[in-house]
Amino acid sequence: YDGKSFDATRRALLQLGLLSMGHLGAVFGGAGEVDPVSHLVATAVGWGGLPRTEASYFSAGPLPGDADKPHELILSDVPTNAFWSITLYNQRGFMVPNGTLSVNALNNVNATPRDDGSYRIQLGGCNAKIANCIPTPKGWNYLLRAYQPSESILLGDWQPPKAMPIEMLTE
């Protein structure tokens, strides 16, 4: 086992995964159901994936130069037959301890909806008074999972909104 070679290979695959920054497509499932290269990249990013009919994965992160700014993501009517979740990861693809809030993920079960039923998720700039806030580690990115996705996700008709820096939303 060559740990240095393993780490270098995983870092390269993580970079490829970050370049995809979008719907990860058919990356988990049986032989003949997945794209082999996408599967290789996806297993470096997240080893425990489900077939497309059980979960769809959307990766995203801040634009260059915006990583230190708090971001906002508004989710409404995510077309799933089960639930959705958002998980934040560091630059190495891991969840990390993040202080007193101890939050790395939110979903439509544990997040607080707004009056209109949508969810405002804040990424970074957190304190105990901000609802639905996930602290952002250095080099952060996030993954939106849609469990038991509806046909609109499976056909590619629905795409999630991107998190935007909060300052851009208030200008």
Q: Model segments located where?
A:
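A compositional/structural signature for long, glycine/proline-rich flexible linkers
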Residues: 1-171
